[in-house]
């Protein structure tokens, strides 16, 4: 999701297609987002079944203030369509402190056809506004998982579709041991997966394959933590 927050991710993974199809989540899952212990936003995932398709919507909104003044704002919205454990399409938009990104992905045969666009503020003596959109295209294997965090199969991948930038993110994932993780409703046992490479973070999944916690290191040295609220 963001360079500043090291959240250019929408990550996740699961152990089997059965888990993905069973979707071990309620219709709405909410995480509170903390930066160095201060609540700075929320991350909400909704699940809806339409026939054979599962629609997954992700909304994140993060605001960091300095001395009461907004210093940083990040907003992300994505819509995924799944049939079983196969991603059929993805639409995502992100605003990262004034810079805007959009990603569109469509399954075509054995591939994902991806188009990504970015625009950003431009300030100069001659012009103050937004630059013309920068449009690029990628073709990835259809098995590539998006970085949307909720899907446990994400933890089994070495290449992910970055849902902010629309490019492949290459990662190495190390599985830890089960541990107790604090949520808003108490502690749950979950396994930690530590990511390095293009994405640097830790994600925790419980025995049912549910995402229950995430931590990310921001470029300024702060720690961003996702705490499950359900």
Set out the residue ranges of the language-model regions.
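Sec/Tat signal peptide C-region and signal peptidase I cleavage site
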Residues: 16-20
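Bacterial N-terminal signal peptides
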Residues: 6-15
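Positively charged n-region of N-terminal signal peptides that target proteins for export
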Residues: 1-4
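N-terminal mature ectodomain segment of secretory-pathway/periplasmic proteins
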Residues: 25-116, 209, 214-216
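Solvent-exposed helix/loop surface patches that form functional interfaces
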Residues: 24-26, 91-190
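A structural detector for short beta-strand units
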Residues: 76-78, 101-104, 171, 199-203, ...
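Short, exposed beta-strand-loop hairpins at the edges of beta-sheets
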Residues: 195, 202-206, 211-220
């Amino acid at each position: 999701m963001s360079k500043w927050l090291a959240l250019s991710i929408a990550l996740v993974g699961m152990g089997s297609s059965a888990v993905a199809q069973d979707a071990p989540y309620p219709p709405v899952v909410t995480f509170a987002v903390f930066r160095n212990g201060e609540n700075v936003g929320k991350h909400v995932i909704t699940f809806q079944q339409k026939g054979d398709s599962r629609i997954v919507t992700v909304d994140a909104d993060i605001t960091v203030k300095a001395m009461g003044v907004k210093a940083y704002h990040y907003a992300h919205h994505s819509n995924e369509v799944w049939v079983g454990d196969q991603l059929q399409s993805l639409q995502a938009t992100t605003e990262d402190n004034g810079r805007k990104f959009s990603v569109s992905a469509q399954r075509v045969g054995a591939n994902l056809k991806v188009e990504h666009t970015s625009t950003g503020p431009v300030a100069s003596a001659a012009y103050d506004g937004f630059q013309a959109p920068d449009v690029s295209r990628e073709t990835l294997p259809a098995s590539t998982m998006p970085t949307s965090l909720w899907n446990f199969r994400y933890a089994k991948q070495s290449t992910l579709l970055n849902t902010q930038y629309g490019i492949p993110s290459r990662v190495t994932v190390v599985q830890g041991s089960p541990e107790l993780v604090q949520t808003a409703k108490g502690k749950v046992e979950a396994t930690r997966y530590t990511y390095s490479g293009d994405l640097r973070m830790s994600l925790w999944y419980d025995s049912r394959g549910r995402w229950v916690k995430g931590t990310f290191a921001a470029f300024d040295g702060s720690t961003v933590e996702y705490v499950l609220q359900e």
